[in-house]
């Protein structure tokens, strides 16, 4: 995926909300953290489960199963039991739409 993909209209994506979507076989999670949009791969590197549904505390998401924390800015695994980072993705607002892009393969 190297093109921008629409996630949601900005006016329907309030602070504190998240969206999960599948783009070209990759499950992404996009978070609105106080008006700043962050996107990571929606998978806990500890056990492969999804991160959406876990709590968001500042710029971190907490895995709902075992409590591993990941940075929504860098994707870094911050606490055990996860030790591997998750991928992050570029996010922008264009024409009133929140969009995400994966440039890992450009």
Model-derived segments and spans:
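N-terminal pre-ligand scaffold of iron-sulfur
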Residues: 1-58, 71-72, 76, 85-106
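Short cysteine clusters
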Residues: 44, 63-66
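Short Gly/Pro-enriched turn/cap motifs at secondary-structure boundaries
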Residues: 80-82
